């Protein structure tokens, strides 16, 4: 039940981000409006919270040893400590996608401020760039690496965490790398938005 709920929440978040990009698209050729920016920002906050909630449910499936979820079966076992739940998530392509999308969503909201992005057009373009990128990544993840794919006949035991992922600090290293990538992407979007007034 929880897995299906998280999957539908993920789909809803994807639709919300796509709608946000659609609402903000006029800022590419116009000066933008306060209403569109408010809607876009609130939509981004709402979608980020939905993504975080969905990811939290995915983590709970690792802790609960729910081997009906394909990624849990492939990278976890009942003998693996719950401490390695996040590490096991990183060991799968689905988890890598999800964590990067979640980090990009959070970092982009942290970098959004009216002091740097002084005009509605700049704010609108920044939010549009981020929402369009997130929408494309989410569609790609859901279509090629769905983290909530189910196994029709679930096994009693998972395959376990690959030995290479048991090394200490590997998770922290990947988290730091993803944070840097997300910060770089959001900063690039912000810079382009700030210096594209005449476009």
Where would I find each of the regions flagged by the language model?
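Polytopic transmembrane helical bundles with strong interfacial aromatic enrichment
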Residues: 1-199
């Amino acid at each position: 039940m929880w897995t299906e709920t998280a999957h539908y929440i993920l789909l809803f978040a994807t639709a919300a981000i796509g709608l946000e990009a659609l609402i903000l698209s006029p800022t590419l050729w116009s000066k933008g409006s306060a209403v569109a920016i408010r809607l876009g920002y609130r939509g981004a906050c709402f979608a980020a919270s939905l993504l975080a909630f969905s990811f939290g449910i995915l983590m709970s499936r690792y802790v609960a040893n729910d081997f009906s979820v394909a990624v849990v079966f492939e990278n976890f076992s009942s003998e693996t400590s719950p401490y390695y739940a996040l590490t096991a998530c990183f060991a799968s392509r689905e988890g890598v996608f999800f964590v990067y999308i979640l980090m990009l969503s959070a970092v982009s909201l942290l970098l959004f401020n009216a002091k740097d992005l002084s005009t509605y057009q700049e704010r609108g373009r920044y939010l549009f760039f981020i929402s369009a990128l997130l929408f494309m990544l989410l569609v790609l993840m859901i279509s090629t690496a769905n983290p909530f794919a189910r196994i029709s006949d679930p096994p009693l035991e998972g395959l376990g965490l690959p030995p290479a992922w048991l090394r200490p600090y590997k998770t922290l290293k990947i988290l730091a790398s993803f944070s840097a990538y997300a910060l770089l992407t959001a900063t690039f979007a912000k810079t382009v938005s700030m210096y594209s007034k005449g476009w």
